[in-house]
């Protein structure tokens, strides 16, 4: 119990590390919170025109979700604790203690924790994102579609209630963090992937 609780706390603290802010500082780029959508995420870093920085941000956000969950599996924790570790890492990204509890929208970190919980579920969610992105070129729509289907994939591929519950909570939080994007989608005003914009629209 103590070890599991410590891992949950560690997952939150790791999730709170903002890869986007770190990468932009090291690369001499503007703070992602002060440009584009204002969101510290890979899509907003991409809007600076630095694809390499965006890729590093994406990988960093994914890994900080993936690693704690893999550690939880390696330690033989029960599904309820693995789900708790996954949610803690995700919540750290959304509400980082190091940045005034104002974080990103969590799509890459969510993918990381899902891959950690069950690799096939993560790959199914990633495939969903890629297919929708290829058709629409809208990052938020791709993320929302993948989030919607993740609990379904989790149920079909694991049958574990705690993992399904984690998938539902992840999806709900992603929807909540994308509420402005949803309004723009309904108005047909959401920008496409790769567009440089000053609008507050980021995944």
UniProtKB/Swiss-Prot annotation:
It is found in: Cell inner membrane. SMART domains: G3P_acyltransf. It comes from the Bacteria. Pathway: Lipid metabolism; phospholipid metabolism. GO terms for biological process: phospholipid biosynthetic process. Disulfide bonds: none annotated. One of its GO terms (molecular function) is acyl-phosphate glycerol-3-phosphate acyltransferase activity. The chain crosses the membrane at residues 3-23, 75-95, 113-133, 156-176. It is a multi-pass membrane protein. It catalyses: an acyl phosphate + sn-glycerol 3-phosphate = a 1-acyl-sn-glycero-3-phosphate + phosphate. The keyword Flavoprotein does not apply. GO terms for cellular component: plasma membrane. Probably interacts with PlsX. This is Glycerol-3-phosphate acyltransferase. The gene is plsY.
């Amino acid at each position: 119990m103590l070890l599991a609780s410590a891992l949950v706390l560690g997952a939150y603290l790791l999730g709170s590390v903002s890869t986007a802010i770190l990468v932009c500082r090291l690369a001499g780029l503007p703070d992602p919170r002060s440009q584009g959508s204002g969101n510290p995420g890979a899509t907003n870093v991409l809007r600076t025109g630095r694809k390499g920085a965006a890729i590093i941000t994406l990988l960093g956000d994914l890994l900080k979700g993936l690693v704690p969950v893999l550690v939880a599996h390696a330690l033989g924790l029960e599904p309820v604790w693995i789900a708790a570790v996954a949610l803690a890492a995700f919540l750290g990204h959304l509400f980082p203690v190091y940045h005034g509890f104002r974080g990103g929208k969590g799509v890459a970190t969510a993918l990381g924790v899902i891959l950690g919980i069950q690799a096939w579920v993560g790959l199914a969610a990633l495939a969903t994102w890629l297919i929708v992105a290829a058709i629409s070129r809208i990052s938020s729509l791709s993320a929302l579609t993948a989030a919607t289907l993740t609990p379904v994939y989790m149920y079909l591929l694991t049958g574990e209630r705690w993992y399904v519950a984690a998938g539902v909570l992840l999806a709900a939080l992603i929807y909540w963090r994308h509420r402005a994007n949803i309004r723009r989608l309904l108005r047909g005003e959401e920008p496409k992937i790769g567009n440089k914009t000053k609008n507050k629209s980021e995944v």
